Amino acid sequence: MANKKRAMSFSEKHQQLVDENFRKSLHVQVLNKLERQAKNQVVQNENDERVERQRFLRVLQNEQFELDMEEAVQKAEENKRMRDRQLEQEERLANELARLKHESLKDEKMRQQVRENSIELRELEQKLKAAYMNKERAAQIVEKDVIKYEQMKRDAEIERIMMEEHKRLLKEENVKQEKRDKERAQYYVDLEKQLEDQERRKQEAYEQLLKEKLMIDEIVRKIYEEDQLERQQKLEKRNAIQKYIKEFQRAQDLWRQKKREEMEEENRKILEFAKIQEQREGERMARVQESEEKRVQRQNLLIQKLEETLRQRDDLERVRQELYLEEYAEFIKLKMKEEVEQRLRKQRDRKQDFKDQMALREVLLQAAKEEEEAFKKAMLAKFAEDDRIELMNAQKQRMKQLEHKRAVEKLIEERRNQFLADKQRELEELQLQQRRQGCINEIIEEERLRLLKEHASKLLGYLPKGVFKKEDDVDMLGEEFRKAYQKKSEVCEEKGSS
């Protein structure tokens, strides 16, 4: 009975050990699954945050583009209003300059009006504003490139971390697998030891049974010797004892056979369980490998789609900026062409007015000369008619004619002087107007050079064509600026030729 109890206790311990190993395996699988789900959730959250940030940048870029277009339309309308105001202010400037008597006040007023209303200075300011706009756009492009590089860098870092984490998990899984293999091998060793112990205990039990049998034989012999007389009476008792011994031996054999069958069945179940566990572990590793390959494929596909989207968006943004710059440059060019044509037309009109004035002067001089001759003849005739009666002799007639001639010449001289004074006044007014225009041109040139000195060095590489009217403008800004500007121009020419 004690052997049977010990065998049952060993079976229960073995079953508990198997159950505990199975629970540990399930617990490890659950922990691995939870860890993978947490990592997948972190990656998904980072991807959602990156997509949301890209969407926000896209909205900001669209709003900036709409603001730029609206600003361009407003600038066009403002330029039109400025041209209208400029024409009105030029008329007011001419009237104001005619009224002003103090030269310093007049010069200051002229400078102020010229700075406010000069088309050339307005064009230069618009070009400088366009250069600042180009510089700002270039800075935005550089900033977007930096953001894109940082994003790619972060993606690469995430990929590296995920690969390292994957390698770490594989390494941990290999360590756990090795540990499980060692535990399984140790379990087999312990099982062999237990089988050996069971066999040893069986042998000891058999030897004990033999000893008990010898003891029983000895007891029977003694009983036979001591109670020879009562043999017949005790024969039945002895037969009963022998029967009991036989039954005990038969029961012992049956118990041994049953325990051997139970041990064989238990060993078979252990081997089957180990085989099933090994098969499950192989299937789990295959599923993990397949899931990892699918995850890497999805991640690579997502990265490719993201790169393609970023590239298409950058191409679209670059095309939009190029179109906007081309349209704005065409608008500035057309406006400059209109202003140049308007200035040339005004210059031609002024030249034509001057020619007309000179021709009119010649006509007036000729008419005045003819008028003088007619007036002279009329006055001589009138004086002659008035004094004809009073003349007494030829001497008085000659003296009277000379007197009339001197009076007529005096009147003619007075008319000529008046005419010359009027023409001189007109010439002085024309010269004054020319001096005013020259002063305005000087003020415009000074303001143009001032704007270039103030802004050109800050906008090197972003200045549009037409900002510098001559090479002296570049030299005026210094040797360092001239070299940098020349180098920038050579780089632009090389890009254009390539």
From Swiss-Prot:
Pfam families to which the protein is assigned, alphabetical: TPH
Gene Ontology MF terms in the entry: identical protein binding
Region (Interaction with BBOF1): 1-314
Protein location: Nucleus; Cytoplasm, Cytoskeleton, Cilium axoneme; Cytoplasm, Cytoskeleton, Flagellum axoneme
Cellular component GO terms, alphabetical: axonemal A tubule inner sheath; axonemal microtubule; axoneme; ciliary basal body; cytosol; intermediate filament; motile cilium; nuclear envelope
Coiled coil residues, start to end: 29-253, 287-360, 390-437
Broad class of the protein's primary localization: nucleus
Biological process annotations from GO: cilium organization; flagellated sperm motility; left/right axis specification; meiotic cell cycle; positive regulation of cilium assembly; sperm axoneme assembly; spermatogenesis
Keywords associated with the record: Cell projection, Cilium, Coiled coil, Cytoplasm, Cytoskeleton, Flagellum, Meiosis, Nucleus, Phosphoprotein
InterPro entries associated with the record: MNS1, TPH_dom
Modified residues (Phosphotyrosine): Y188
Family as reported in the entry's similarity comment: Belongs to the MNS1 family.
SUBUNIT field: Able to form oligomers. Microtubule inner protein component of sperm flagellar doublet microtubules. Interacts with ODAD1. Interacts with BBOF1.
Function field: Microtubule inner protein (MIP) part of the dynein-decorated doublet microtubules (DMTs) in cilia axoneme, which is required for motile cilia beating. May play a role in the control of meiotic division and germ cell differentiation through regulation of pairing and recombination during meiosis. Required for sperm flagella assembly. May play a role in the assembly and function of the outer dynein arm-docking complex (ODA-DC). ODA-DC mediates outer dynein arms (ODA) binding onto the axonemal doublet microtubules.
Official protein name in the record: Meiosis-specific nuclear structural protein 1
Annotated source species: Rattus norvegicus
